[in-house]
Amino acid sequence: MLLPKRTKFRKMHRGRLKGVATRANTVVFGEFGIQALEPVWLTSRQIEATRRSITRYVRRTGKIWIRVFPDRSVTERAAESRMGAGKGAVSYWVAVVKPGTVLFEINGLSEEMSHQVLKSASYKLPIKTKIISRESGN
């Protein structure tokens, strides 16, 4: 599971998911990547499940880059607790993803195999995605 070693503040405001990604929206490290088409909070569990799905196929022949990191804490209250008494405890960590963000990149596989691997990995994600290549430029 991914989570920060330490943060300046443990608990954070929720914020809003508006606009599109102006950074991290092109394939930089690998040849092919998964690009988000919707805004979402990706949990560390979802990122890990997707990483495992890709690793199953890539093994030693290729390389994986995870372009998102869950650095935002999400708090939850106990199920039957009364209102007030402060903010709840940190429950899990999320990465804020805007439309256009490249989530994962791979290299070292054929184009056909890469598409197959990334398509199967995208089923682990709770959003619509598209597979992009370095040449396509988008």
UniProtKB/Swiss-Prot annotation:
Keyword presence, Chloroplast: yes
Q: Which InterPro entries match?
A: Ribosomal_uL16, Ribosomal_uL16_bact-type, Ribosomal_uL16_CS, Ribosomal_uL16_dom, Ribosomal_uL16_sf
User: Does the record bear Cytoplasm in its keywords?
Assistant: no
Under Gene Ontology molecular function, one entry of this record is: structural constituent of ribosome
* CDD domains in the record: Ribosomal_L16_L10e (cd01433)
The Gene Ontology biological process terms listed for this entry are: mitochondrial translation
Q: What is its main location?
A: plastid
Q: Which residues cross the membrane?
A: none
Q: What superkingdom does the record give?
A: Eukaryota
Give the matching SUPFAM superfamilies. Answer: Ribosomal protein L16p/L10e
> Which keywords fit this entry according to its UniProt record?
Chloroplast, Plastid, Ribonucleoprotein, Ribosomal protein
Q: Where in the cell is it found?
A: Plastid, Chloroplast
Q: For this UniProt entry, what's an example GO CC term?
A: mitochondrial large ribosomal subunit
HAMAP family to which the protein is assigned, alphabetical: Ribosomal_uL16
Regarding protein family, the annotation reads:
Belongs to the universal ribosomal protein uL16 family.
| Quaternary structure annotation from Swiss-Prot or TrEMBL | Part of the 50S ribosomal subunit.
Provide the protein name: Large ribosomal subunit protein uL16c
Organism from which the protein derives = Emiliania huxleyi (Coccolithophore)
